[in-house]
Amino acid sequence: MLKLLLLALPLFSLMHRSPLCQEWGIVGGQEAPGNKWPWQVSLRANETYWRHFCGGSLIHPQWVLTAAHCVGPTIADPNKVRVQLRKQYLYYHDHLLAVSRIITHPTFYATQNGADIALLELKNPVNISSHVHPVSLPPASETFPSGTLCWVTGWGNIDNDVSLPPPFPLKEVQVPVVENQLCDLKYHKGVYTGDNIHIVRDDMLCAGNEGHDSCQGDSGGPLVCKVNGTWLQAGVVSWGEGCALPNRPGIYTRVTYYLDWIHRYVPKDF
């Protein structure tokens, strides 16, 4: 069986683990400028302190988009989760927001089977400013063709088994979109499975190359691409094998595939 690697830091015992292993954060990138990525959020779990475990994106003043494997497959207690809006450095003057509801996609049970997407409803809407505001969702017709240069952001590890060091700055890396069929072929290299078995599914999007990728702790965070002058969220950090390895692009949940589901809960206008 393909050894798949989760991108989330260990969190709830309810997280689906087998047959999955951990993966690792932003590789090959740099610290993000303080005025960029105003939709980036950090999800926190209450341990000895409110610890970062996944990323997410603000898509509405009261809604956060993230990966289902961060909080599922069963619905986690929202009282055990907090959201920190865009911060340059983790744990520096935190202002954590309460969550009223966590909604995982009903067909999710493991990352490699797709539907790795979830919504968090905040108890109160946030105040929108130049520093904090939602990212735009793409139109259903947007395909993000192969070679499109996009950006992924997060506070995850900076290499395999290498944690992001203090002061834990938000990192960014530019990654090219890889066409699904090519990505699937890449993932079949060195894997003993039939060519008729699709590892990369239609609801997934691939991006990254050797030396440039997302990693552990980045799960749930946004992959964004600038289209006609507007930043659109193309994907949600989901899974991969290793970190920035040859023939192993990062795999993201394709946002356009789940627009109808998202808008069952999240208003289109605000």
Swiss-Prot record:
GO biological process: proteolysis
Alphabetized UniProt keyword annotations: Disulfide bond, Glycoprotein, Hydrolase, Protease, Serine protease, Signal
Claim: Hydrolase is one of the keywords in the record: yes
A Pfam cross-reference name: Trypsin
Protein name per the record: Mast cell tryptase
InterPro entries: Peptidase_S1_PA, Peptidase_S1_PA_chymotrypsin, Peptidase_S1A, Trypsin_dom, TRYPSIN_HIS, TRYPSIN_SER
Disulfide bonds: 54-70, 150-225, 183-206, 215-243
Glycan-linked positions: 46, 127, 228
Domain Peptidase S1: 26-267
Organism: Meriones unguiculatus
UniProt KW Protease keyword: yes
GO MF terms held by the record: serine-type endopeptidase activity
Catalytic activity: Preferential cleavage: Arg-|-Xaa, Lys-|-Xaa, but with more restricted specificity than trypsin
